[in-house]
Amino acid sequence: MNQDFEHQLSFHSNNNSNSNHHHSYNNSINSGSSSSGSNNSSNNNSFNDEIEGGEIQEEPYISSSSIRTSELDQKILFLSKDRNLSKRTGSEDPQYGSFFNTLSEPLILSQQSHQQHKKQNRDQHSSSSSSSSSSSSSSSRSKRSNQPPPLVGIAAINQQQQHLQKQKQQLQQQQIQIQLQKQQLQQQIVQHQTELQNKSTPSKTSSASSPPQNTLSAPAPPAPAPTSAPTSAPTSSSVSSLTQPQKPKSVQYSQPAPLEIREEKVDPNIKEEFENTESKISSIIQSMICPISPLRSPFNESIVYTNISSSSSDFDYNNSNSNNSNNNNNNNNSITENNTDKMINNQPSSTNSKKLKTNEIDSKDTSNNNLNGADFKKTTTTTTTTTTSSTSEPIKSPNSSSSTNSSASTTPTVKKEKLILKIPKLVVKSDSGTNKESNSSNSSSTTSTPKSKDLEEKKEKEKSEKEKGEKLEKSEKSDKSEKTEKTEKAEKTEKSEKSEKSEKTDQLEKAEKLEKEEKTEKKKTEKVEKAGKVEKKEKPKDKQTKQEKEKEKEKEKETEKEKEKKDKVSSKKDELQPIEEDKKKIGGKRKSINSSKPEFKSDSIDMDIDEPNPKSSSNYNDSDDDSENEIDKSDKRSQKKSKVESPPKSSKLSNGKDKKSTTTTTTSTSSSSSLPSLSSSSSSLPLPSSSSSSSSSSSSSSSSSSSSSSSSSSSTTSTKIKKEEPPPPPPQQPPPPPPQQPPPPPPPINPFSVSEHDKKIIEKETGKDLGSSRDRDNSSRTTNGRDSDRDRDSREGSRDRDRDRDRDRDRDRDRDRDRGRDRGNGDRGEGDRDRDRSGRSDRDRDRDRDRDRDRDRDRDRGNDRDRDRDRDRDRDRGRDRGSDRDRDRKDSNSNNNSNNNNNNNNNNNNNNNNNNNNKKDNNNNNNNNNNNNNKRDGNKDGSSSELTPKKTKQEEKLIRSQIDQIKEDAKDLKKLAKELQSKNQNECLEMYLQVGLKYLLTTHYMIEVNDPLPNIISFLSEISLFFSNTSRLALHFKDDPKASLCFKCESFCCIKMFCLKKDNLKHTRKEVSSVYSSFLPNSSSSSKSSSSSSSSSNQPANPATAPLTPNPGNPSESPSQASSSSNPTSTTPSATTTTTTTATTTPSTTATTTTTSNNNQPNTSHVNTKIAQYFKDTEDIFRGMDAWEKSILHSNIPGFHFNFFYQPYLEFIDQVKKESDKQS
């Protein structure tokens, strides 16, 4: 039976150096005559090559003109819209993959479809030859410069139409050349048919396994792996080229790098599987006949093709064409048409044995074989076509992970379709066991001789019978091999897991050792620093040298670790090589099972890994050297593209200081599930090669992975660059480690452990808390109430006890140490014992001094606390008085009656509560005595503005020396003044006045030095007496101005004494007012009325009413006396304000204390002593007021009016000197 075969190989290449030009080659091999009489028509343009002939039927899809036109429109639209195919990294279309992305432009669709329908019935005879490819490649170079950039809108459509017309004209010229080449090829086919008749099947087997007989040294065609049942077996496209290359003159190629050719021994089991080469040849012929459907994207992980079923008639053409295929050695379809003999001879024969070993090779294996094949990267201008294979498997969706074999159908149908790829080289193996016949009509089939047709029919019948017998044998062998392979793979995975676990444990132990060493070094450095602080003898140079030495040691350790890790990696490589070779032998079924979980392992990772992760999950690989060998230097843009597509490379660590961060990456299962284009074969790796050197499977996987990286980050983390070895050794495929192996858990950490650094921080904080808590207590005294004072007392008491306990413990420790030293060194001399005894006494003395200092500090703190507490209590009482004063005014009449009744009740309860009052009074007396004994603490809040902060010792010495000097000068002046007084001379008054001013200056310095308060008050009282006597002497001499100055000085001294006693007077007044609070409401109105009436009527108050009130002086006298004066000064209103406040505040405690003091009446004797003390202390203010009034009476000095309560000593002394100078 005469049949026609047609092989349409469409090329689409995109060169980055030019403006994305698309060109195509139309190649076909025609022989025999057509039985069906159908014609093959192809519409050749630069954007679409469609082969149509006979009745095109596709089992999953209904072939019709509408479906065909829709597919054509979509392809035309895509190709006309987006030409920059090498840079497309967008999301994949679920039907067309990353290549055929549908774009909606109805104008282009309508115009392009109209042009396609016009040329559908035009017969085209396609053939593959070197001249056609070379001419098309040369024309493609010329057309690159004419390629317009993609435009938008009507102008873009017009330009594209014009460009299409130009290319059509050029293609018509090419068709004429192609027809001439067809005739030459037909003659060659007749010759091969005659040669095949004379050869037997053993010669075919030898030609399949041994190197080719032709001068073209290239790997043998891939052997088919038949499957016995419709079980899951992933499909893969087969590669074949059937024409003898002819070296074109118009194309020049760069010389490829010389490669060594290795021959590997083929296993006897594999030889038995492929003894019958007729099935192999039929699969090769079948793969050439069936083109790829445009609905299937070549950029999917594996290409699924249409199912072409035909009658079970044998092919006579297989025998005629087998020698041609063996001579060409399946140089990836029509590579021989484009490449020279030198290019093809560079492929080592090692790939032949690799292809024979595998029943089904996924895209990853094909990419590895291509890497060690001919160096196609050198030919930047040549392009290759996608391999078209007719498999016995139904069409699956691009997302399907496995495809099943379908039974042979008897209807002879051929689906001839065209696919344009951007990747020039595709190496795909066909595993179809039963190759179905397909009918294709060619107008040139009539030229073949009838003898060749008869021979072909006979041989095809023989093949069909033999193939049926081979199916059963191969299926049994495949089952056995799969079982053995499963067991071997399980053992290998267990070994790899054990090795990885051992490495992890070793690395963890090393990390722990490093941490321990670092801790020890830190301890040493800390000890050195402490010793340096104590001794302060180490020089900075020594420290720097030590630090440098430590750094050098650390560097050496790190370098040693790196070396050890490198050695481990290299040893592991050697272990993995035999495993990799065994994995090459695994059958298609095993790979289909594991295809959904591909895991990749880098051959070498030069990293300083601190905490090891599984190497399968590492993202980076050091592939700098190999990438330089792979990337074509002449094509820089393709080199950049490959760098973009490849994952980021890990920068080598400098000196091993940078440690690899433990990155837990997702395994390849997530990446395979995220890629919608995954088919039965496992995902291939993106190789960093140029567009003219990478295979279509690797490029398809790279494009799909790059497109999916935008949607899922897990795919990018799982994919890795497979490091390529130099050409002489065959490519090794590392075995996949156990899937989804989690990273090792971190070493256990003790949650209760505390580092030394933390210990130091805690010690520092605890040491600071002792001082800071005191400051906090001082700052919170004014805000906290009585409860906070109580808490503070308990806290400070416990702190003091702790301090004493620590001191006693230290003393006991020292004593025990000394006893042990004395006991151990009893033979020592007396000098040593004396020395130890003196040291002990010194320590005890220091300890006692510290204890005394602490006791004094605690006493001062207690006094301050008592004074602050009293101040707070006064503030609270004043607040209560202010609120109760209005209430007392409103209810004065009712209160009078109620108070009379309360007085009777209180008299009955006085005896019961005398003891409690006595205790309180004693406590108050103790507090007053403490306040009086303080140096000058009680006057800090008073009105003595002359008080200064504490001086240093040197300043105190200077001030005290000045005090002594002033006293001596005063004595001398006093002697002179007495001598003048004995002579009744008036100059003595001036002398006495100067002496008194010197006394005032000494009091100023005494306050500066913080002398005891009683000393200052007694000294001021003596000065006041001195000035009063001087004023009397001045009156005796009838010198009124001098007398007035002396009275003013006396008033100044009395007022300053009152200011110093003011705090004590407050306390006594409060105590007396609290005692007599029950009696005050009746007398308060009278006292207020008396004070107001006296101030208004200028009448002196009755002094007899003084003992009835807590303010016995009845301060209304001072305003009356001041107002009675002829010239009231600024000091008198100030005096009135201070005294009236005391008078008004004392009766205001009635409301608060009436309820509490009813049962707490004091003892009359004790109260009388308090009142007497108060009277004595308040005499100073009245003396001062009297002296001021006398000075005004005797002489009114203009401009000499000051507020003595707040005037500094020095200012007053200067003013007095000026006035005395004026008077003199």
Swiss-Prot record:
Q: What's the source species for this entry?
A: Dictyostelium discoideum
Q: Show the coiled coil region(s).
A: 950-991
Question: What name appears for this protein in its UniProt entry?
Answer: Uncharacterized protein DDB_G0284459
Is Transferase one of the keywords?
Answer: no
User: Which stretches does the entry tag as region Disordered?
Assistant: 1-67, 111-151, 193-270, 316-416, 430-957, 1078-1167
Q: Mark out the compositionally biased spans (Basic and acidic residues).
A: 260-270, 451-585, 630-646, 755-892, 948-957
Give me the stretches of Pro residues compositional bias. Answer: 727-750
Organism superkingdom:
Eukaryota
Compositionally biased tracts (Low complexity): 10-48, 126-140, 193-212, 228-241, 316-338, 379-413, 430-450, 662-719, 893-933, 1078-1108, 1114-1165
Key words, A-Z: Coiled coil
List, as start-end ranges, the regions of compositional bias called Polar residues: 242-255, 341-353
Mark out the compositionally biased spans (Acidic residues): 49-58
